[in-house]
């Protein structure tokens, strides 16, 4: 019984972090052999759709000049790109500084109710079909808007997820380095997910939706971008992923600040699993159920439990004299945790990320507003 439980936990951990990527790659490889995708053509300037770039900002006075300089460098006709900043609850100089930019429409409410509420507030004031949501502290590449407009030519695409690139200010910036490695891995899975059928969610750094597909999500939603994009999948549309439109931001200042983010994301992941549980039904959503459970649900729920159960189970099996195989695996596990304690980047961030899932559980039960403390960036 103990050996069975050990191997079950091992299988879940390996499948979540290695196996799914391999299976996904093989499925995409077979799909490429069976079908030939027709590439979408570039759009000439006279046929480009109107797009609204919406930024939800809370007390972002320090970053406005840099963000607006980046926005003005976007390669898109100015008469077709509308700029909206939603600054609900801001009590610094955010609104004053934005008033210096005549092209920006500021939407403001004195009450701070969280990002989900701010997004809904902003969407109501927008009338373009395509809405490009991004964060104040993320910088977009100049071609980003053209790329998402090109992908939105496909009527089956309801959302576009851009790539997130995490920058580190120095080689010693372990939080940013660890986060950057994670997002490289995550971007690979997103690209393959999108090629198989649909990406499993979009990150708020660069999330583009068709306005009419926006769902009225609850104000206490923690992962608003993820829920909004996956609700679009629930309606039968796809999330396209592209690395040609990307958002750049600096990583958290340190692991303590990064823990704030990971804790919120873990809590939001658990919340999302419950609110999107209908997508796990393989009879209604066969491909999406496979992708959603494999890519998201496992790592947000059972996999961290299985990961940290491996050492005690393995120890009991070694003490019971079950065989040399268990002794070898136990030694490898101890070496892995020792490398994390010694500061080896990959193992340390992997353990750190999974530990924060448990902290996220406590965060979820203690947070009912959808608001959070921002992590300080490097």
Question: Which residues does each predicted region cover?
Answer:
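Short aromatic/hydrophobic "clamp" motif used to bind/position activated sugar donors
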Residues: 131
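Acidic helix N-cap motif at the loop->helix transition within catalytic regions
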Residues: 62-66, 80, 91-100, 143
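A conserved acidic beta->alpha catalytic loop
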Residues: 70, 86-95, 111, 138
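Long helical/loop segments within the catalytic core of UDP-sugar-dependent glycosyltransferases
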Residues: 28, 108, 117-118, 128, ...
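Juxtamembrane C-terminal module of membrane proteins
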Residues: 23-50, 256-257, 278-289, 333-378
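Cell-envelope/extracellular polymer assembly enzymes that use nucleotide-activated donors
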Residues: 49-52, 82, 227
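Catalytic donor/gating beta->alpha subdomain of glycosyltransferases that bind UDP-sugars
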Residues: 152-185, 220-224, 228-292, 349-355, ...
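Short, acidic, metal-binding catalytic loop of nucleotide-sugar glycosyltransferases
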Residues: 69-80
């Amino acid at each position: 019984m103990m050996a069975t439980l050990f191997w079950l936990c091992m299988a879940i951990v390996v499948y979540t972090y290695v196996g799914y990527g391999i299976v996904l790659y093989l499925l995409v490889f077979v799909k490429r052999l069976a079908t030939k995708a027709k590439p979408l053509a570039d759009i000439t300037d006279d046929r480009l759709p109107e797009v609204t770039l919406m930024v939800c900002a809370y007390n972002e006075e320090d970053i406005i000049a840099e963000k607006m300089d980046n926005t003005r460098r976007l390669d898109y006709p100015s008469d077709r790109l509308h700029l909206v900043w939603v600054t609900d609850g801001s009590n610094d100089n955010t609104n004053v500084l934005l008033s210096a930019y005549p092209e920006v429409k500021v939407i403001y409410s004195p009450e701070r109710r969280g990002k989900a509420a701010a997004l809904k507030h902003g969407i109501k004031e927008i009338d373009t079909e395509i809405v490009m949501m991004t964060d104040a502290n993320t910088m977009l590449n100049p071609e980003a808007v053209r790329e998402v407009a090109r992908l939105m030519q496909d009527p089956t695409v309801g959302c576009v997820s851009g790539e997130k690139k995490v920058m580190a200010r120095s080689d010693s910036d372990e939080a940013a380095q660890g986060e950057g490695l994670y997002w490289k891995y995550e971007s690979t899975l997103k690209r393959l997910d999108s090629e198989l059928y649909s990406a499993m969610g979009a990150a708020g750094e660069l999330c583009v939706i068709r306005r009419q597909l926006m769902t009225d999500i609850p104000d206490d939603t923690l992962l608003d971008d993820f829920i909004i994009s996956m609700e679009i999948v629930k309606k039968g549309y796809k999330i396209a992923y592209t690395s040609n439109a990307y958002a750049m931001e600096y990583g958290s200042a340190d692991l303590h600040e990064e823990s704030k983010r990971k804790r919120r994301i873990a809590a939001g992941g658990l919340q999302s699993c419950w609110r999107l549980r209908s997508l796990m039904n393989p009879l209604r959503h066969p491909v999406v159920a496979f992708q959603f459970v494999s890519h998201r649900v496992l790592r947000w729920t059972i996999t961290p439990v299985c990961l940290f159960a491996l050492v005690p189970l393995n120890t009991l099996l070694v003490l019971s004299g079950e065989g040399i195989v268990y002794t070898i695996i136990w030694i490898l596990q101890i070496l892995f945790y020792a490398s994390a304690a010694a500061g080896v980047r990959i193992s340390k961030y992997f353990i750190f990320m999974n530990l924060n899932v448990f902290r996220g559980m406590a965060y979820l039960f203690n947070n009912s507003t959808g608001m959070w403390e921002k992590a300080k960036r490097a």
